[in-house]
């Protein structure tokens, strides 16, 4: 995995995925973990989790993202399962840093939300 692969995925996610911008910190964390966990499962050929309505929601977003990743980035089919997990973990970290920790939106942690 290279830094450019992570940059590609981050740019794609920032541009195309609205689930990262939910209104509360816990929503954003839950979506980042849930959707990207399902993306990792799909890209590594594992069966996605679909036992609960929440898992099915994450799966729906992940399916579109995984298909786009395969279509847009030729390197996605050339990296192994370990590299995919490493890449997704790096993407999760960067998203948390960008959309939660570095966010200036004070409503993310407002006590009335």
From Swiss-Prot:
Enzymatic reactions: N2 + 8 reduced [2Fe-2S]-[ferredoxin] + 16 ATP + 16 H2O = H2 + 8 oxidized [2Fe-2S]-[ferredoxin] + 2 NH4(+) + 16 ADP + 16 phosphate + 6 H(+)
Q: Which domain of life is it from?
A: Bacteria
Q: Name one Pfam family in it.
A: AnfG_VnfG
Alphabetically sorted, this entry's keywords are: ATP-binding, Iron, Iron-sulfur, Metal-binding, Nitrogen fixation, Nucleotide-binding, Oxidoreductase, Vanadium
> Which GO molecular function, any one, fits this protein according to its record?
metal ion binding
The enzyme's first-digit EC class, named in words, is: oxidoreductase
Offer one example of a GO biological process linked to this entry.
nitrogen fixation
**What cofactor does this one take?**
iron-sulfur cluster; vanadium cation
Annotated EC: 1.18.6.1
Keyword Iron recorded: yes
Record bears the keyword Oxidoreductase? yes
Protein task: The key enzymatic reactions in nitrogen fixation are catalyzed by the nitrogenase complex, which has 2 components: the iron protein (component 2) and a component 1 which is either a molybdenum-iron protein, a vanadium-iron, or an iron-iron protein.
Subunit info here reads: Hexamer of two alpha, two beta, and two delta chains.
Instruction: Output this protein's name.
Output: Nitrogenase vanadium-iron protein delta chain
Q: Lineage of the native species?
A: Bacteria, Pseudomonadati, Pseudomonadota, Gammaproteobacteria, Pseudomonadales
Gene responsible for this protein: vnfG
